Amino acid sequence: MKMSAEQISEVLKEGELEKRSDNLLQFWKRKTCVLTTDSLNIYADTQKRTKSKELKLQSIKKVDCVERTGKFVYFTIVTTDNKEIDFRCSGDDNCWNAVITMALIDFQNRKAIQDFKTRQDDESGSPGQHESRMARAP
């Protein structure tokens, strides 16, 4: 899956992460990942020729369980439907969890501002509602 020029300009981090498989044996599989301002794209190969799995930031609740061992940094992404996805990266490249967390915070802030502006526009577009709300205020 090719990324558009717009997506490429929004890349926050690109590199390798290991993802723990969901099957019974739970092997760690190396994945090429691209974090943008809106999603974490996970590819099976380094050339990004395979179709990516896109984990939208709006579907991520938090980055949790950060643990550092001698060789790896382990962390878990918890989705809004409470699914847990385990990742690890080498200790040399230990800022993946921080960059994902910061991207998530930035995304949530942008969404909150957008929601606030939408609410404000809705209220300013109908002054009758605003007056009736003020009339109810003590």
Curated annotation (Swiss-Prot):
Signal peptide: none annotated. It is found in: Cytoplasm; Membrane. One of its GO terms (biological process) is positive regulation of apoptotic process. Keywords: Cytoplasm, Membrane. Residues 117-138 are annotated as: Disordered. Pfam families: PH. Plays a role in regulating placenta growth. May act via its PH domain that competes with other PH domain-containing proteins, thereby preventing their binding to membrane lipids. The PH domain binds phosphoinositides with a broad specificity. It may compete with the PH domain of some other proteins, thereby interfering with their binding to phosphatidylinositol 4,5-bisphosphate (PIP2) and phosphatidylinositol 3,4,5-trisphosphate (PIP3). This is Pleckstrin homology-like domain family A member 2. It comes from Salmo salar (Atlantic salmon).
